[in-house]
């Protein structure tokens, strides 16, 4: 959203409660190696959100008219060009951090500003219209337009919004699970009992039909 606004000539201000991606990497390494948790800069909070430390798989919504534009933004920021046409686009495990940084630099080059370690701790409204935001409990920034992209883990922000009487509506969510099966189980279910007598390729689990008798 900030990049789109910047491209139109506006100068968006972005307040990120966590650190920039490089500082965030150091904080994450400290946690993984020694258990030192920075509550505002970790695998959830910080530049790029949780996706910064994902495996790089893109969940595309083919019927979304904006998807092509989003893919193009990724490519311009350093993602592989093949994600334009792959059925299951993947930008690589280490690429998200590079892409996030490049998008930020593009926003700044277009006139936007990015502030890190800057949590919105309060919102001032009058007559159901936002007038200002408070950063880190101290700095007041006037605005009449505000986008909140806080993910699902900023519970303190949701509590603040609720206390301010701002209407919110929950959205549907999905919970993923990891299922592991022996390779023999998969091959037998897909190719039959003589699976070891034929040449076979790896099966994409999305297209794997579980044969219930084999579960017993």
Regions found by a protein language model. Give the residues of each.
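Residues forming the flavin
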Residues: 2-216
């Amino acid at each position: 959203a900030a990049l789109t606004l910047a491209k139109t000539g506006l100068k968006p201000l972005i307040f990120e409660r966590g650190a920039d991606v490089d500082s965030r990497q150091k904080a994450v390494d400290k946690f993984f190696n020694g258990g030192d948790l920075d509550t505002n800069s970790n695998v959830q909070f910080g530049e790029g959100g949780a996706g910064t430390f994902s495996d790089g798989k893109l969940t595309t919504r083919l019927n979304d008219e904006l998807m092509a534009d989003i893919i193009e933004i990724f490519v311009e920021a350093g993602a592989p060009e093949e994600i334009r046409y792959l059925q299951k686009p993947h930008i690589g495990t280490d690429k998200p951090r590079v892409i996030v940084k490049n998008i930020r630099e593009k926003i700044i080059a277009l006139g936007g500003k990015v502030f890190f370690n800057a949590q919105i701790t309060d919102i001032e409204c009058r007559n159901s219209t936002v007038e200002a935001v408070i950063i880190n409990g101290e700095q007041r920034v006037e605005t009449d337009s505000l986008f909140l992209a806080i993910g699902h883990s900023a519970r303190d922000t949701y509590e603040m919004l609720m206390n301010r009487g701002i209407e919110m509506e929950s959205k549907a969510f999905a919970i993923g699970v990891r299922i592991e099966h022996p390779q023999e189980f998969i091959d037998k279910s897909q190719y039959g009992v003589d699976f070891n007598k034929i040449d076979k390729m790896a099966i994409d689990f999305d297209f794997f039909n579980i044969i219930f008798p084999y579960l017993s």
